[in-house]
């Protein structure tokens, strides 16, 4: 599950996109960089074509590869129902004392967009990676994610918990 969350964040994917992936949708090279085919993406369905997300962070690819090695070819990467993912996600937010932050699975895409824009300072890059054709919509995702991040005040306990659990990624 952690590998899918990392992929969703890195690839600025919609929740349904990363939760419905199969191992057959992912191609990684020996350096753990690669491509994810989104056969059922929102815009892909409208346009009648497959959309793609690139994995250019080898740590994301390596974690995804470790999960996929345990799966038969073309098996769903998420082993279990989506409803179970949502429960575990919410339980994780509670364990990290982040329920007041109101994080939801769709926050993963927004956070990824904000991180990408702040890291690279290139709106066109973020729009391309997030697959937005509208600057207006991309800015909503970026600005909203950035505002949430800037307004967030984490307690010492939450920071310590996040640091502790980060070691398991």
Language-model-derived ranges and their functions:
Residues 1-2, 82, 86, 109-110:
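Short, leucine-enriched amphipathic alpha-helices that occur as contiguous helical runs
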Residues 6, 107-133:
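C-terminal catalytic core of tyrosine-transesterase DNA break-rejoin enzymes
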Residues 12, 38, 78, 89, ...:
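Mobile genetic element proteins and their domesticated derivatives, centered on retroelements
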